[in-house]
Design a protein with these regions (language model features):
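Mid-domain catalytic core of redox enzymes
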Residues: 2, 17, 256-371, 376-382, ...
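Mobile amphipathic helical/loop "lid" adjacent to a hydrophobic cofactor/ligand pocket
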Residues: 86-87, 91-92, 97-207
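A conserved FAD-binding loop/helix module that cradles the flavin
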Residues: 446-469, 473
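N-terminal Rossmann-like FAD-binding beta1-loop-alpha1 element of flavoenzymes
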Residues: 18-46
């Protein structure tokens, strides 16, 4: 684990009296920023357009036909052990992280009964890679001889600037094809992994994919183990975080979209549908579409170079979540979560009654099961009817006993608001810092100075956004943690030169004060 005091160490414990920050967006990024600021004495107002907090990880209350209430979410979320900053955020409301329960393994299911597992692997590279390659039934000695060793070595040679410089203009599919793995091995070992980032291989940057390999597998000292929340997110995470913030003087405004932001001589004016607020600091912790809409309605935030960066942000293809309340049990021994590949558009199957209290209670009372199906990167031409048929066929193939079960209740969600990491998108991608003092971005679309992804990227960006604003008043930052920023076989540099390069990259990506190969 590495520790980063960004953008600078600071000397004061608390901010000067009278400072006010507005955080637009009550997802993980916004709440992380709000916590760091409120803890240091800044008066914080969080403005969220939905009636619930959490953003894309949020949960809201619905009712079954029986009248029973339940919390619905946008799908399964894994809390990997190297999500250091997200876990620090959660420890503010649960120091022992008792809200989480481990899933020690998750199988990868393929056609014809093929199965891969990541349990029992060594934690560190290259031994985890060697062990996985050795035990997989999808590769023999002849296959290993054909593998492109130089291309495969790039997974162990991760170095931020070099990786994106060399691989951002290549697609993930082009890189994976260059490995020359046999089709079954590629499908079972790589396809599920790459699909989990919502971006299809034919569009995703190979540089981003290599960063993900480094972050989740070859550079991750914690192993491919993750935890899940035992209760719905609203009860276990977001309602407690709201109370935590309110106890520290924060105000949370729900069902209140931000319409525009206006620059003032000494701060900002934030306009909502019902009021205007003045603030010293503003963090825009919004989805890509919401951010772009807000900036289009904020003519004073018109720096052309920066707006070109924010306008370059895109969305990946839609994803679908289908939760089914079924009238009978599944076969004993089924995994709580399984990745799937090679059978239609189905990407994973979650059995909520095996890990979430609310679903477990329902299953115990009724004798049924709560099953959730996910599909990522759904082609735009696929209709909902076609997708439903495809996902159900996949469920029946992998878990044949479900053919005999009836669906008592269902919820179907299809959304398109996840950020794209397309080929060539790294250079223009905005970081947390903006051209305007006191205005920052936060979200999992931001470029960061350390390897990070998904929920961890969101939480880290929010903390960094708060740190940048606190640095103006020499307030001590929230320490940020990450796995090592370089792979074990990254190109060698002289130690002093490497240290200087890393300080330069981290400082200037965070502050935007000087040009850098990975400038924000």
């Amino acid at each position: 684990m590495e520790t980063h005091l960004l953008p600078k160490p600071g000397s004061r414990e608390r901010a000067p009296d009278g400072l006010h920050a507005v955080v637009a967006g009550g997802g993980l990024a916004g709440l992380a920023a709000a916590c760091v600021l409120a803890e240091r004495g800044v008066r914080v107002t969080v403005i969220e357009k939905e009636s619930y907090l959490g953003g894309r990880a949020g949960a809201w209350t619905e009712q079954l036909e029986s009248g029973e209430s339940f919390e619905m979410e946008r799908g399964f979320h894994a809390f990997f052990r190297q999500y250091y900053n997200l876990r620090k955020l959660l420890q503010r409301i649960d120091p022992e992280l008792s809200m989480l329960t481990p899933l020690e393994d998750y199988p990868i299911l393929g056609p014809g009964g093929r199965t891969e597992t990541f349990s029992g692997l060594p934690l560190k590279a290259p031994w985890n890679v060697i062990a996985l390659t050795k035990r997989t039934p999808t590769m023999g000695l002849r296959d290993l001889i054909k593998v492109n060793g130089l291309a495969a070595l790039e997974m162990l040679r991760y170095d931020d600037a070099r990786c994106y410089e060399r691989f951002d203009d290549m697609t993930a599919r082009e890189y994976l094809d260059s490995l020359r793995f046999p089709p079954d091995a590629k499908r079972m070992l790589f396809d599920v992994f790459s699909h989990s980032f919502f971006n299809p291989e034919e569009e995703m940057s190979a540089g981003e994919l290599l960063m993900m390999f480094h972050f989740y597998f070859v550079g991750n000292p914690e192993g491919l183990i993750f935890d899940v929340v035992k209760q719905p997110f609203s009860r276990s995470v977001f309602e407690p975080l709201a109370r935590y913030l309110e106890e520290r003087g924060a105000t949370i405004k729900r069902s209140c979209p931000v319409e525009s932001v206006e620059r003032l001589d000494d701060g900002y004016r934030i306009h909502t549908g019902s009021e205007s607020l003045e603030a010293d600091f503003v963090t825009l912790a919004l989805t890509v579409p919401a951010l772009q809409k807000l900036l289009a309605q904020s003519p004073s935030l018109d720096d052309p170079s920066w707006r070109k960066r924010t306008d370059s942000l895109g969305l990946t293809l839609p994803f679908a979540v289908w939760r089914l309340w079924m009238d009978g049990p599944l076969e004993q021994g089924r995994a709580p979560f399984a990745g799937t590949t090679g059978v239609g558009l189905l990407d994973n199957i979650s059995l909520y009654h095996l890990f979430e209290d609310e679903s477990r209670d329902w299953a115990a009372r009724t004798g049924g099961s709560v099953v959730e199906l996910h599909a990522y990167g759904v082609p735009l031409e696929v209709t909902e009817e076609e997708l439903r048929k495809d996902l159900l066929a996949g469920l029946h193939e992998f878990y044949p006993e479900t053919r005999e079960l009836q669906t008592l209740e269902e919820r179907w969600l299809m959304r398109r608001d996840c950020p794209a990491f397309h080929r060539g998108s790294d250079a223009p991608r905005p970081g947390v810092r903006t051209p305007y003092e006191g205005l920052t971005l936060a979200g999992d679309f931001c470029k960061l100075p350390m390897p990070s992804a998904l929920m961890e990227r969101a939480a880290t960006s929010g903390m960094l956004a708060a740190n940048i604003m606190l640095a103006r008043h020499d307030v001590k930052p929230e320490p940020l943690y990450s796995i090592k920023r370089r792979g074990m076989f990254a190109p060698w540099r002289k130690r002093k030169a490497q240290a200087e390069l890393e300080v330069h990259a981290l400082t200037h990506q965070a502050t935007g004060t000087a040009p850098s190969p990975i400038q924000s």
